[in-house]
A protein has these predicted regions:
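Preference for long, amphipathic alpha-helical scaffolds in soluble/luminal domains
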Residues: 1-622
Length: 622
């Protein structure tokens, strides 16, 4: 018996694994995939209502149900946050407020008055992000002249020129290109009400930026505003046509753009403004696709910002094999078959920097052939390497080849592109909505290392360089930054197992420092948690309410490092004692990251797959 079995009486780690495994198997679709809800914030729902209002396709039932969901997420002080139990967020609150006004909520209603008071106290509409002011400009409640300009002529910049569209991360370029169209057309379709209550009765001081690149970009923006008033007509027409062609070429089979909300919504707006009617097949596919991202339940109507079936499926496969499911189990064979069919076999934007690299990656979503990513591909390779399927081996080989070709110059790996590191993009006045480049990250690089190690490539130059990158990326306190998960717990939980798999000995200082950091940040209740505020405030690193997924990440690192002491036993006990009767765990806190500091995700399957992996490896003694 383990210590956990001795001290928990009727509930053991083995019991928890069995219950979680059975629950996960029940969630598999007949086709073989898994997909949990991808929960974000109410800007998705607010902007959906704004889109439909602008296009003239408002549905009263949908509006009422979306408003009900938005109200259900409002905090007692009248604000909305970007993640559960997070601080108020101004732009999110403004967009939610405007959406509720569209739904008929009176400005003098108590919940609206509280929201408006907060908004005014934070500087009002003038202090919001560019996206929010874009929406308000389209509805006549903000001046287009007061927005930064990114003209569609951007499409003419050659690929070697700074700030060409491929200098931006894939999610940013997909959003910026359609917004260049919207900003050039400058539509105004006034709302049926004013928003005076969202403006303070004083001038909001603007930050003074007069030196270096900031001053240069301010001057550039002034020049672009002058050009915007009198653009060269032939050049502008050609630029808009090129932008439209670029957008149309990237629409996916399901009607989406990149399988994510921002470029999807703005692409629909851009094409509509260029004359594509609501009955045009491209627009119709886009609108129909949004319906498939809609969830309706007792709380109302809400929109997923994205869907994660490939990611969820391979994490589920890895969890089930960690939990002892045989490699030839029908559920795993069915999942492997579905994953293999999802391989992206054509070129995408990644080909711009890697034109000679044959395709062979996987995307995050059901349909996203333009943008496979290294992180999903690494987890696919790990998952397929563990199961029995007649078509797995050639798919794995293509995935390994594609991953290897996506390495950046410094030996690390970004998510969607190689060497997407031009930090100048971050300085554009337009780019205040989150991360806009895709440099190598510790978690993605670690997953590649782990995948390659599973393929007996630990001694390859590629893996050695990646390991070297990870060693340099370790924080002075022993942790690693988490780009795609919250935050240092995720980064450390990803890197330590990868380094061990690559042959780094557990007694090495890099591993001992990581173990010490995790042990120092274990909470009194035995779990681990890290609040998303750690992305803006380093004092939160490793601190926050214990969650099932973050406790599992810490355990995965400690177990890989060979730890078997009290810290591990307390973490396992935390998971065993807090498991629900149905085999899963509660997790209201968001532990996924879209843009550090700006956009976060609650992956509803994380609370099941990662604890199952951790407990399964614990029982195996590894």
């Amino acid at each position: 018996m383990t210590a956990v079995e001795d001290t928990t009486g009727t509930r053991t780690a083995a019991d928890a694994v069995e219950a979680a495994r059975e629950h996960l198997l029940l969630l598999q679709s007949p086709e073989g995939w898994w997909k949990g809800e991808l929960q974000t914030n109410v800007t998705m729902d607010a902007e959906d209502l704004l889109l439909r209002e602008f296009l003239g396709i408002r549905d009263e039932d949908d509006t009422r149900e979306a408003a009900r969901w938005i109200r259900s997420q409002q905090a007692a002080d009248g604000t909305w946050a970007n993640f559960h139990d997070g601080p108020p967020e101004l732009s999110t609150t403004v967009e939610a407020y405007v959406a509720l006004r569209l739904a008929g909520d009176a400005p003098d209603a108590d919940h609206m008055a509280r929201a408006a008071a907060y908004i005014r106290g934070q500087g009002g509409v003038p202090a919001t992000r560019v996206f929010t002011r874009f929406w308000l400009a389209m509805f006549g409640r903000w001046s287009w002249d007061e927005l930064p300009v990114v003209p569609p002529e951007l499409m003419f910049l050659p690929r070697w020129f700074p700030l060409n569209v491929y200098d931006f991360a894939c999610w940013a370029r997909q959003t910026i290109v359609p917004l260049t169209v919207v900003g050039a057309v400058r539509p105004v379709r006034p709302l049926p009400f004013e928003l005076d209550e969202l403006y303070p009765d004083y001038d909001v001081p603007r930050p003074t930026r007069t030196t270096g690149w900031d001053a240069a970009f301010q001057a550039l923006d002034k020049a672009l505003h002058i050009y915007q008033r009198r653009p060269a007509k032939a050049v502008r027409r050609a630029a808009l046509r090129r932008a439209a062609d670029w957008i149309i070429a990237r629409q996916e089979r399901d009607g989406s753009w990149g399988g994510i909300q921002p470029p999807w919504v703005y692409s629909l707006l851009a094409l509509h403004l260029l004359g594509y009617g609501l009955d045009h097949p491209i627009i119709q596919r886009g609108l129909d696709g949004l319906e498939r991202f809609t969830i309706r339940d007792e709380k109302g109507r809400r929109l997923e910002a994205c869907q994660s079936p490939v990611w969820d499926t391979v994490l589920a496969m890895n969890a089930l094999t960690d939990a002892g499911l045989p490699a030839g189990h029908p559920a795993l064979e069915r999942a492997a078959g579905w994953v293999i069919r999802e391989e992206v076999k054509g070129p995408g934007d990644w080909s711009v920097r890697r034109p000679e690299l044959p395709p062979g990656g996987w995307a995050f979503e059901f349909d996203n052939d333009c943008y496979p990513d290294v992180d999903d591909t690494a987890e696919v390779v790990i998952a397929l390497n563990r199961v029995q399927h007649p078509l797995a081996e050639p798919a794995i080989e293509r995935g390994v080849r594609w991953m290897a070709g996506m390495v950046s110059k410094d030996g690390g790996f970004g998510a969607f592109d190689a060497d997407n590191t031009r930090t100048l993009c971050r300085r554009l006045p337009f780019c205040d909505f989150g991360e806009v480049i895709d440099p190598p990250s510790a978690d993605v690089t670690a997953h590649v290392v782990e995948a390659m190690a599973h393929r007996e490539m630990a001694d390859s130059l590629l893996v050695k360089r990646a390991v070297g990158w990870l060693l340099k990326a370790q924080e002075p306190d022993g942790s690693w930054f988490g780009r795609w998960g919250a935050n240092h717990v995720y980064g450390t939980g990803s890197v330590v197992p990868a380094l061990i798999a690559a042959g780094v000995r557990p007694e090495k200082p890099v591993i001992r420092d990581a173990v010490a950091w995790l042990e120092r940040h274990q909470r009194d209740d035995g779990g681990w948690g890290e609040d998303l505020r750690s992305y803006r405030d380093r004092s939160w690193a490793g601190h926050g309410a214990s969650t099932a997924s973050q406790t599992a990440w810490a355990l995965l690192a400690l177990l890989a490092a060979g730890e078997r002491g009290e810290s591990v036993e307390r973490g396992v006990r935390w998971l065993v004692e807090r498991q629900r009767p149905d085999g899963t765990w509660d997790e209201d806190h968001f532990t996924g990251t879209g843009f550090p500091g700006d956009f976060y995700i609650n992956y509803h399957l994380y609370r099941l797959v990662f604890p199952l992996s951790a407990l399964g490896r614990y029982l195996k003694g590894s």
